[in-house]
Every structure is written in structure tokens, then in C-alpha cells.
Amino acid sequence: ELNSDHSNVIWAVHALTGDGQVADWWSGLVGENALYNYSSHFIICANLLGSGYGSTNALSENPSTGTPYFYDFPVLSTRDLAQSLESLRQHLKIEQIHTLIGGSLGGQVALEWAYTLGQRLQHAIIIASTAKTSPWVIGFNEAQRMAIAADNTWGQAHQDAGKKGLEAARAIAMLSYRNPSDINTKQKESEEKLDGFLAASYLRYQGSKLAKRFQAFSYWSLTKAMDSHDIGRGRGGVENALKTIQ
């Protein structure tokens, strides 16, 4: 539970397709007997704005129309996502955060938030992330969105629009997450095989697995937020912005 001086708050920020159930996907780090445990720490992980698991997203009701936003959902930035977490912190009356931790998109959001938290934050752990998204990553993200847009259901006003495209998008993403030598080793084939390769079935499995639990609208929104990530925008550049994070 939260101690009297709020010195035991651990705040995790989930990645692109993650959710607020941090102990489920980071069980080696968060849990009863983990480094960050519930007996010693007050652990928070909220679903990000735009996420398919909660908060407001493209399937939420647009108050102007009374119907879901779908393709009219506003473009988000990591700065917007960080501000939504800051609003939550203020609502919860959390005065300080001992450790803020996030990976990938979560790391980008954590960096943005660390900039604004100032002395309220003691430690930040940023994993597999960056202060500014590179053209290389933007290219991978665009290829994934092209896969979604190529699905003939994309453009239709229903929650499952773009599902098959999302499967292909996930396959593209998996190639960026894995090292070529790792795939060459783990998906190695016998010389006799002509079809049905392990690498192909692995990517199809990963695509199908994600599409069963996630929606293309959130994938689109959050990869767009990743594209525009730049902690130095309007702050004198990346180096100047990072210098303010103590």
C-alpha cells in the first residue's frame, strides 16, 4: 500500500500492445516475490490513452456524434499520453514517484513524463526506447499501417475492421523485434523442406495471436504517436530536454 510519504510508488508504462496488468507481462520484475512487490511498493500501471484495453480510444463514443470515433479519432502524441498519466497522478494525489519504468512506446511516454515531473520523480528506467523516433522506425511503422490499410475491411465502421491487416502488421513488427541470427537459429529448417517453413508459421502465429486480443484502430493510433515522438520538440532539442531530467 501507499506509505505516508509516498516514497514507495513504482509506476510502469506499458508498451504498444500492452495493458495495465503489469504483473502478467512483467512477472519477472513485478509481483509478490519480484523486485517490485506489493508488500513493499505501491505499483501503478494504467492503460494508455488510445489503447485497446481501456481509456479513450477510436471505439469510444464521440460526444459530438453519439457514435464511435472510428477514423475520426484525434491524432495522439507521446506528449499527450504523458499528460494523461500526469492528470491521473494529480487525481490520485500521488506526490512523488520513486521509479518510473517503461519499455518501447512505454519508454517514450515515460521520458516525456519524466521531463514534466521534475523533482517529483526520483528514478527513471527507460528500456528499448529513444528520445526521438528514427526514420528507420517510422518506416517500419508505416509499413505496418500500409498492411492494415490494404485489408479491404479497413474503412468500414466496425470494431473488427482491419483485423487481417493487423496480422500482417504484427508479422512485420516481429521482424524488427528479432535479430536475424536469432531467427536463423531458432527457425532453422532441414534441407528437404519446400514449403511450410518455421519462420513463416512463426510470423503467422504471432499475427493471429495479436489480432485476437487487439484492434487495428489502437495499433494505428499508437504507432502514429510513436512516429512523432521527440522529447526535444519545442524545448531546444533532445540534448537540452534530457539535461533537465535529473
Where are these regions (language model features)?
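A short alpha->loop->secondary-structure connector
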Residues: 62-67, 121
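N-terminal cap/lid subdomain of alpha/beta-hydrolase-fold enzymes
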Residues: 2-63
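Conserved acidic catalytic loop of the alpha/beta-hydrolase fold
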Residues: 66-75, 79-99, 108
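Alpha/beta-hydrolase fold catalytic core
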Residues: 192-246
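Structured loop/turn residues at beta-strand edges in well-structured enzyme cores
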Residues: 5, 92-95, 119, 243
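Conserved hydrolase catalytic core segment
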Residues: 95-137
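Alpha/beta-hydrolase-fold enzymes
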Residues: 120-121, 126-209
